[in-house]
Amino acid sequence: MNYFAVLCIFSCICFWQFSDAAPFISVQSSSQARSQKVMNGMLRTLYDYSVQDSVNDATGHLIHTHKADFNSDVMSPDEIESVRQQLNMA
């Protein structure tokens, strides 16, 4: 009888401990903007950028992923690269 009581108490404690697991967190965000203008009879992209962020704890550690892209028809390649670097640092 004592073994049965100990087994019941142990089972209740195990069930109680395993039911208090932390919830899985997953958050995703996406943003996109574009501006175009007709210049010299041609439609030009002034800016086109997109940003994606995601946060999750699938591995037990909180992981943040950030991706950004930028493009423009009126800026020089060096200026475009500079803006891309600034977006990826955010």
Curated annotation (Swiss-Prot):
Gene: Acp26Ab
Primary location: secreted
Name of protein: Accessory gland-specific peptide 26Ab
Span of the signal peptide: 1-21
Swiss-Prot/TrEMBL GO biological process terms: mating behavior; sexual reproduction
Cystine residue pairs: none
Expression tissues: Main cells of the accessory glands of males.
UniProt function note: This protein is transferred from male to female during mating and may affect egglaying and behavior after mating.
UniProt keyword annotation of Metal-binding present: no
GO CC aspect terms: extracellular region
